[in-house]
Amino acid sequence: RLKKGDVPKDLDRLEAQILKTTSGIARGPRGYLSLINRVKPLIQAGEVVVVTGDFNEPSHQDWTQAAAKRGMDRWVKNTSGRPLRFKVAWAGSVALEKVGLSDAYRTRFPDEIKKPGNTWTPPYPDGLPGRQPYHHQVLDRIDRIHFTGVHLRVLDAAVVGEDKRICEIAHSGPWVSDHRAVVATFEFTGSAEKLSNPKNDRNKSKGTKY
């Protein structure tokens, strides 16, 4: 709709339409609910859980009300006359948060305006087979690391890619993927025994980095 110049005035209604249209992602066999059903018992048992991947959906922690007012225009070449930035409480990331999984990048960089952390998609020349022109792309952070664990702490997180101006870590050679990579450093503040048996708190240690 936006590419055709159909810019809605009621953004709350647009958000509802987007969530309805994308609801199948969460319910699908490779979607969020399948993941949550597998990790929820581990989380409830107090286990350390780290989940990472290409989620094929943005995060509600990026599409915030603040970003809607002051954030970047996500459309590479916007021809609509209105910035592509509005609030959307994306259902998948909301569901992960509700089950107790935190976003490593947003834990390290809570300001979604200064640090958008986009992983989709690095620039590429027009005419590549199977890819639309780059100026049609919408930039977003769809590759993420989520974690939980009372003894797990984020020390650092980064996007890895082709340009230091965009990424915390720049690759020295050609970047051939259509996604940027993500990495995080964690500290386990408990003992090795807690890592294998999180309900046993008898031993203490200064912490281990992973």
What spans do the regions from the language model cover?
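Active-site regions of metal-assisted phosphoester/phosphodiester hydrolases
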Residues: R1-Y210
